[in-house]
Amino acid sequence: MAQGQQPIFILPQDTSRYVGREAQRINILAGKVLAETVRTTLGPKGMDKMLVDSLGDIVITNDGVTILREMDISHPAAKMLVEVAKTQEDEVGDGTTTAVIIAGELLKEAEKLIEMGVHPTIIALGYRNAALKAQEILEEISMEASDRDTLMKVAITAMTGKGSERAKEKLAELVVDAVMQVEEDGEIDKDNINIQRIQGASVNESRIVNGIVIDKSRADTSMPKRIEKARIALLKYPIEVKDLETDAKIRLTDPSQMQAFIEQEEQMIRDMVEKIKSSGANVVFCQKGIDDLALHYLSREGIMALKRVKKSDIKRIEKATGARLVTNIDDLTAEDLGEAGVIYEKKIFDEVLTFIEECRDPKAISIILRGSTKHVAEEMERALEDAIGVVASTLEDREVVAGGGAPEVEIARKLREYADTISGREQLAVSAFADALEIVPKTLAENAGLDSIDVLVDLRAAHEESPYMGIDVFDGNIVDMKEAGVIEPQRVKKQAIQSAAEAAEMILRIDDMIAARGFDVSSKDEEDMEGMGGMGGMPPMM
């Protein structure tokens, strides 16, 4: 700037900006630390995390996406990896920790290449091609899954090490039965499986309800508590006199006029109840409120009614009973009613629930999940949700791969062969991608208290003979995972590798960070981050 000229501020003076290698280093560090945070939770021997929020509420879990969601991370690069975990959870239901640690390792390997002088664009291109090749290799080593026994193995593998160890066979049975029941034309909507978590009993008392359970009680205690041969009406709008859409004032000159108004309102309510009765309905689920007078008349007619039922529950009741949601009571007919063998109210532990059972071929069902304490029941629920996701994926795709780190080692082996066919610096990126994938078997070994280097060497040697060789973390041996029954959906691995590669590529392409306010990474903070392997003591990351 020439002498005497005033400086020009394009950005606010309190803005932080990091350019080039500095920006890349900060983002890579954030990704590495985040991956290190969840790494110890991977596998059957993984450890749990205790998360305590500002209100003192405690969550104890080893579920990757739950940990990341509860941590409330604000660092922009770290948030990208959190999104990877959330996408993995939404798409396939499991593999969240795997996806995050692969992404973190890809960034770690990329950092080495950048220090060697390889441009981030070349690394990103190599990663993209390696990810595509990995998908092809996964197809080659996949196995067909078509029977119930395979689905059971998939469910048990997903739940192993997630707090449900003692009852995993029982829970796997529930999951497989539930998923197969709600399947429609080869597709599974996981929302049609409702998990009702109730503490106060052994997990072995968990069961499937051939229908739906909702956490609602009768709208009035004078109504029947149990209805056999239930005929179900679903109403979208309230059973009450509608308010005027515009403000209006009415002048009354005689007390009898007031009485006439009251009688007219009562008659309208009676007509609504009569319409419900004439349709043949003996149970009503209303999405909105129900007038007290309407409750009185419904009770007098022996009709059970529940008000303010959640929209999601209404949808499941539709699927389970065949009922149709009616927007106007005047349009309600017998054809709109659903059927169930019995509907009853029951108190379990300290919760009052309504059971809709003995439905004819329900396409939405409930699982009653028991647990001795609140924290146990919550972790069981997370394990069950993971298992439902992987069984649904398997049933839809009918493709599985071996577990125990077998697919990662096989893909890494073949990627190194593929790298030898590539010229230029991109070859280094493909080889780095292969090295990064081996973080999965290494972590499984470390979490089991084994020597990761010895395990990895043995695995590489075993894969010269079979692509299904993985690590048995319970005895430390290298075994055929296919024969051991440790299998996972192909979709879980595909999604994890693809999402991790895309996130790493996106982070590597960032060469300029502009933070509006308060974002700063001092050298001291970086030393703290590198030395901790967790997220605490890290102001810029939280």
UniProtKB/Swiss-Prot annotation:
* Classification via PANTHER family: CHAPERONIN (PTHR11353)
The record's listing under InterPro entries reads: Chaperone_TCP-1, Chaperonin_TCP-1_CS, Cpn60/GroEL/TCP-1, GroEL-like_apical_dom_sf, GROEL-like_equatorial_sf, TCP-1-like_intermed_sf, TCP-1_chaperonin, thermosome_alpha
What is the protein's species of origin? Methanothermobacter thermautotrophicus (strain ATCC 29096 / DSM 1053 / JCM 10044 / NBRC 100330 / Delta H)
This protein's UniProt keywords:
ATP-binding, Chaperone, Nucleotide-binding
| Complex formation | Forms a Heterooligomeric complex of two stacked eight-membered rings.
Q: What does this protein do?
A: Molecular chaperone; binds unfolded polypeptides in vitro, and has a weak ATPase activity.
Q: What's the family? A: Belongs to the TCP-1 chaperonin family.
Q: Which domain of life is it from?
A: Archaea
Q: Which GO terms describe its molecular function?
A: ATP binding; ATP hydrolysis activity; ATP-dependent protein folding chaperone; unfolded protein binding
- Name-wise, this protein is Thermosome subunit alpha
